[in-house]
Amino acid sequence: MDVPPAPGLFVTGTDTDAGKTVVAATIVGRLAGEGLRPGVYKPAASGGDGDARTLWEAAGRPLDLASVCPQSFRTPIAPHHAAREEGRRLDEALLVAGLDPWRAACDVIVVEGAGGLFSPLSERLLNVDLALRFGFPVVIVDGGRLGCVGRVLATVTAARARGLVTAAVVISQVTADDARTADDPTAPRRIAADGVDELRRRLADLPVALLPHRGAETLPALDWMALASRRPSPRP
């Protein structure tokens, strides 16, 4: 009997440096803590393999680091530009095929994209294209800075227009709190928390979670396995 491929989540951002790796690693840790075997895949990375290593460690080091991120580049720019800068070639077919070793090796796969949902991965492919090919619901992450509501709403709207299922939104506070008090409306924690409240009101059909700065243990408990199994509703 054929074993159905593992379900998965595609963790993406509203922009680069949105806190995707922290969120993805936290989700992976939750899945592992439930006794599941999570797989982790980062199709391409620029700026080194630090993000891939974080995911690999969170998953308990399944397979090997090269399987987590088969294409890693040192230069911190878009992967296909980084490849060209280093005299290498980004293998577009491998972006897709690199997921294959994980499909039968785990119970659920967490993929972390590079940059935002519409950031380029290659000359032709954007992150959104890869999410569609994998068929995984997306987890949209924003760094919780001023403007997070507009960025998230735009990304959710664009994802839906392309036929993607949005599993959840996570506001990951990437800016540390400083000497300002929690009563200051411009304090990072207030901006992030107020953004979550506004998004919960406007996206009543989606889970919207807050991940405080360096507070991975406080990410609200969601059924990530159930969210990974969501599929698009048939169109009329």
List where the protein language model places each region.
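C-terminal lobe/tail of nucleotide-utilizing enzymes
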Residues: 2-3, 157-236
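N-terminal phosphate/diphosphate-binding loop that engages ATP/GTP or pyrophosphate donors
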Residues: 3-8, 22-89, 93, 98-104
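Hydrophobic anchor at the beta1->P-loop junction of P-loop NTPases
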Residues: 11-12
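Conserved glycine(s) of the Walker
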Residues: 18-19
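Hydrophobic anchor at the start of a short beta-strand
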Residues: 38, 109, 138, 166-167, ...
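Short internal beta-strands
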Residues: 40-42, 139-142, 167-173
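Switch II (G3) loop of P-loop NTPases
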Residues: 95, 99-123
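Inter-motif core of Ras-like GTPase G domains
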Residues: 122-145
